[in-house]
From Swiss-Prot:
Stimuli inducing this protein: Induced by heat in roots.
Gene that specifies this protein: WIH1
Protein name: Protein CYSTEINE-RICH TRANSMEMBRANE MODULE 13
Annotated segments matching region Disordered: 1-58
Keyword Cell membrane appears in the UniProt entry: yes
Transmembrane region(s): 59-76
Gene ablation phenotype (knockout): No visible phenotype under normal growth conditions, but flowers of the double mutants wih1-1 and wih2-1 have defect in megasporgogenesis. Doubl mutant plants display retarded growth, and twisted leaves, siliques and roots.
Organism: Arabidopsis thaliana (Mouse-ear cress)
Family from the record: Belongs to the CYSTM1 family.
PANTHER family: PROTEIN CYSTEINE-RICH TRANSMEMBRANE MODULE 13, RCG49325, ISOFORM CRA_A
């Protein structure tokens, strides 16, 4: 015999209504948001945005060249051995 507990069925809470305490909740976002040291949002109107220096570029072409030369040397070595 199969027994299953029956829980009372009720209506789900209404969707799309603000919480009882209003929105946003008290203390959200905290005072001084964003914290010091983080981006402060958009610059004031009439002032240019801050300039950031570019990160140094890595030598991607050298890595590819080194890989191709290593493969070529490996092929030559295998050709000489067999």
């Amino acid at each position: 015999m199969y027994h299953q507990e029956q829980h009372p069925v009720g209506a789900p809470p209404p969707q799309g209504y603000p919480p009882k305490d209003g929105y946003p909740p008290a203390g959200y976002p905290p005072a001084g948001y964003p914290p010091p040291g983080y981006a402060q949002g958009y610059p004031a109107q009439g002032y240019p945005p801050p300039q950031y220096s570019q990160a140094p570029q890595q030598k991607q072409n050298a890595g590819m060249l080194e890989g191709c030369l290593a493969a070529l040397c490996c092929c030559c070595l295998l050709d000489a051995c067999f």
